[in-house]
Swiss-Prot record:
EC number in record: 5.1.-.-
UniProt protein name: Uncharacterized isomerase BH0283
InterPro entries registered for this protein in UniProt: Phenazine_PhzF-like (IPR003719)
One GO term of the biological process aspect: biosynthetic process
Single GO MF annotation: isomerase activity
Domain of life: Bacteria
Enzyme superclass (EC): isomerase
Keywords: Isomerase
Active site per database record: 47
Gene Ontology CC, one term: cytoplasm
Family indicated by similarity: Belongs to the PhzF family.
Stored Pfam families: PhzC-PhzF (PF02567)
Keyword Isomerase appears in the UniProt entry: yes
């Protein structure tokens, strides 16, 4: 019987059952899209990462339970964590990932993993779907959009934490997801956020690395700084360090393996 190892990693946290869980499937060679989608649906996590050796690194693809996505931060962090944990790559060696969003790299920084991602600067939108505001039940300070998501700033951290979106309205919007953010009222964090992706089968993502490729540049202009400590205020919650340099966003997070298993196929 053919078996395939698969792991579940809690990303952007140093505690089990916090952060964002991702499944990581390490393959010897590529598998077909239908098989990968079936596995992702079976795992039923916000993302499942599939990787196999390619050139001087690894090919990496990400699937939600419903569809493939072009960029995913927490599953990339989880993939790097597993490759180092299993000694596929020495801890001193950066990992190169070949993805649909180009070449991404991961490096160890002590107990943290640093991801080198492209900046996804939002552009302000003056016209936007009614479902966006009705679905969130808020009055925005700002509405913008990049190639993936809408970005909305609101004026209250408490209001952000209390949001109870109407997902049947939000999933009608032609976008991957909706990022809602506010300046943090604490001295610990610069800003907080929540991220909703009903269109791809994930109502609320616990911690979204790729969203911070948009949040980082946005708050860089607002706060006139290049380094941030951010918190995603989902039920599980998660923390990220962010550094901006030119058109790159460096995301730093931690990860914990919580499950090792085998697919019997």
């Amino acid at each position: 019987m053919m078996t395939t190892p698969i792991y579940v990693v809690d990303a952007f946290t140093n505690q089990a059952f916090k952060g964002n869980p991702a499944a990581v499937c390490v393959l010897p060679t590529s598998r077909d899209d239908i098989w990968m989608q079936h596995v992702a649906s079976e795992m039923n996590l916000s993302e499942t990462a599939f990787l196999h050796p390619y050139q001087d690194g690894y090919s990496l693809r990400w699937f939600t339970p419903n569809t493939e996505v072009d960029l995913c931060g927490h599953a990339t962090l989880a993939s790097a964590h597993i490759l180092w944990e299993l000694d596929h790559i020495s801890a001193e060696q950066p990992i190169t990932f070949y993805t649909k969003s180009g070449i991404l790299t991961a490096s160890k920084r002590g107990e943290w993993i640093e991801l080198d991602f492209p900046s996804e600067q939002p552009k302000q939108e003056n016209v936007y779907p009614n479902e966006l505001i009705d679905g969130l039940g808020i009055q925005p300070l700002y509405v913008g959009r990049n190639r993936f998501d809408y970005l909305i700033e609101i004026d209250s951290e408490q209001r952000l934490k209390e949001l109870n979106p109407n997902f049947s309205l939000l999933e009608q919007i032609d976008t991957r997801g909706i990022i809602v953010t506010s300046k943090s009222t604490s001295t610990e964090y610069d800003f907080i956020s929540r991220c909703f992706f009903p269109a791809v089968g994930v109502n609320e993502d616990p911690v979204t690395g790729s969203a911070h490729c948009c949040l980082g540049p946005y708050w860089q202009e607002k706060l006139n700084k290049n380094e941030f400590l951010a918190y995603q205020a989902s039920k599980r919650g998660g923390m990220l360090k962010i550094k901006l340099q030119h058109d790159r966003v460096f995301l730093l997070g931690q990860a914990v393996t919580v499950l090792r298993s085998e697919l019997l196929l």
